[in-house]
Amino acid sequence: MFGSIFDIYYKTLDAIFMPIIKVLHPALAILIIAIIVSLIINIATKLLVDQKRVAELKKEIQEFQVKFKKMSKNPEMMEKLQEEQQRIMQLNAELMKMSFRPMIYTWVPIILIFIYLRHVYGFGGVYQELNPGWNGVVVYLPIILSKILFIDFWHWLGSIFYKGGFKIVSNTALGWLGWYILCSFATSTVLRKILGIK
């Protein structure tokens, strides 16, 4: 039953994305998909979260943190701040609740996109069928960036949990998942600024 559901799902997304997957390098195709997904998530956040209230909460919490830091050396003032700290904890809880609201609607589509990208760019996936010599590398990062992003650690971690499939060909190489995550963080940050999301 689930096999036929996923077949329909894959065929539907293939109809949408296969033209760019066949023509573009995997790095560019995944970047485009990450931009589309980030745009959808950020628009959902913009529509579902009261941005004015988020800004108010963040400002009040930040002001308290500055005050707390200044008065941390004075025990008398710290007692006074204890009461305010309770209120700030409630504001933090409200802020967290607001930030989780869009996740309720976007979590499932994100998981489905990961499943689709694995179907296309994973070991034995569609892209490897189209390009049999492909080794699974989507992009090679500059050495300094691979050190900053701890690529060696992620390769090691992946080797523990994922047996078989593509082999690690370089300490600077990223596969589809690493590249998608990197693109997603970058595009989401830019889109949040453009859309004025706090």
UniProtKB/Swiss-Prot annotation:
One of its GO terms (molecular function) is small molecule binding. The lineage of its organism: Archaea, Methanobacteriati, Methanobacteriota, Methanomada group, Methanococci. Disulfide bonds: none annotated. One of its GO terms (cellular component) is plasma membrane. The chain crosses the membrane at residues 23-43, 107-127, 137-157, 168-188. This is Uncharacterized protein MJ0480. It comes from the Archaea. It is a multi-pass membrane protein. It comes from Methanocaldococcus jannaschii (strain ATCC 43067 / DSM 2661 / JAL-1 / JCM 10045 / NBRC 100440) (Methanococcus jannaschii). Keywords: Cell membrane, Membrane, Transmembrane, Transmembrane helix. It is found in: Cell membrane.
